[in-house]
A protein has these predicted regions:
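Conserved pre-motif I regulatory segment
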Residues: 11-54
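Pre-Walker A (Motif I) flank of P-loop NTPase domains
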Residues: 46-53, 80-81, 127-129, 289-293
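Walker A/P-loop
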Residues: 47-67
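Flexible loop/turn segments at secondary-structure boundaries
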Residues: 59-63, 90-94, 138-140, 166-169, ...
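Conserved Walker A/P-loop ATP-binding site and its immediately adjacent core
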Residues: 62-64, 78-105, 135-136, 201, ...
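Conserved C-terminal RecA-like helicase domain
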Residues: 97-99, 103-116, 151, 155-164, ...
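Conserved RecA-like ASCE ATPase "motif II neighborhood" in helicase/translocase motors
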Residues: 114-163, 167-188
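Conserved P-loop NTPase catalytic core
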Residues: 155-161, 165, 172-288, 292-301
Length: 314
């Protein structure tokens, strides 16, 4: 791109402000994706093609797939529109939307509700477009109608599926039947001959898809977590008992379910005290803005409400 900064260079400049240590890895993955014969170069634009990007849990997958999108926009102008699919959660979809707007400043980025703005931008701006959607039937069907062949003029979509093993795969394959989300995604991919980039930390179910399925990846990429990453091997080592795992008495849940007593069992008390000390340190010493604690003592919602009341009383 002559005369102005490339999409990838601008993305990396923005990324440098918030996560500078991730930039070399993103650069390497983006370069491999567009230069290797196994990925973008293997796609013929006449039929769907799928690649899977694998990274550890909470290791920076969002930055890596957005970097790939920027590199693709530089390399291949035949992708005018990118779809970014998130889990079926408003908060996650909005978080991903904000991150995309912040980092992809050379793109026009749209919320799933911004159909009018999206359509206006097609004639008013030459920038690549990205639409961020939840994997939910309503927005997916809506954008399946919008992104028809008349609008695309025969050009394919570039679809990024974040947490690709969640929701999008066929959850009714043993019935046998096809789940709604899987059916919509399959139609979206097939009718637009899309390039489908699946992103996950747990690829097992994706690799087990039928060989002729559009969800079965034809190539794969993997990146290592950066310096300082603390993942499953740290918290749950195979050689020793994890320090983060503390076993409690078997009867603690029964005590928590007792409706006539507000007393908390010793295991939960210790967990709460540990959280309070940790939160104080993180907020006052490390200057973090928040610190959260998840308590999931039962699969029954009625238990959750009773136990919440006891904890609040405590």
């Amino acid at each position: 791109m002559k005369g102005k900064m490339s999409h990838l260079d601008k993305f990396l400049e923005n990324r440098m402000l918030s996560a500078p240590k991730s930039v070399p890895s993103i650069q390497n993955i983006a370069s491999e994706f567009i230069s290797s014969p196994d990925h973008l170069s293997a796609y013929d634009f006449r039929q769907p093609f799928s690649t899977i990007l694998v990274g550890q849990v909470q290791s920076g997958k969002t930055g890596h797939y957005l970097g790939i999108a920027a590199a693709v926009a530089d390399k291949e102008p035949r992708f005018p529109i990118f779809l970014l699919l998130t889990q079926n959660s408003v908060s996650l979809q909005q978080q991903t939307l904000k991150e995309s707007i912040k980092l992809l400043t050379t793109f026009d980025v749209f919320d799933e509700s911004s159909q009018v703005e999206f359509e206006l931008s097609l004639s008013s701006s030459s920038s690549p477009k990205m639409v961020v959607l939840k994997k939910n039937k309503t927005p997916l069907r809506k954008w399946l109608r919008i992104l028809n062949q008349d609008l695309l003029s025969g050009r394919p979509l570039f679809i990024i599926d974040d947490e690709a093993d969640s929701t999008g795969l066929n959850t009714r394959v043993n019935v046998p039947d096809q789940s709604d989300i899987n059916e919509i995604l399959e139609e979206l991919i097939s009718t637009t001959n899309a390039y489908f980039l699946q992103v996950t930390a747990t690829p097992q179910a994706i690799f087990l898809q039928n060989k002729v399925s559009v969800f079965r990846p034809k190539s794969h990429l993997q990146f290592k977590p950066g310096t300082g990453y603390l993942g499953g091997n740290f918290f749950f080592p195979e050689s020793t008992m994890p320090y983060s795992y503390k076993q409690t008495d078997n009867n603690e849940l029964n005590l928590l379910r007792n409706p006539i007593s507000n007393e908390l069992p010793i295991g939960l008390k210790k967990a709460i005290f540990t959280f309070c000390i940790t939160a104080f340190y993180k907020l006052k010493i490390d200057n973090d803005t928040e610190c959260n604690f998840l308590i999931h003592p039962s699969v029954r919602q009625i238990d959750h409400q009773l136990i919440l009341t006891k904890i609040q009383f405590f």
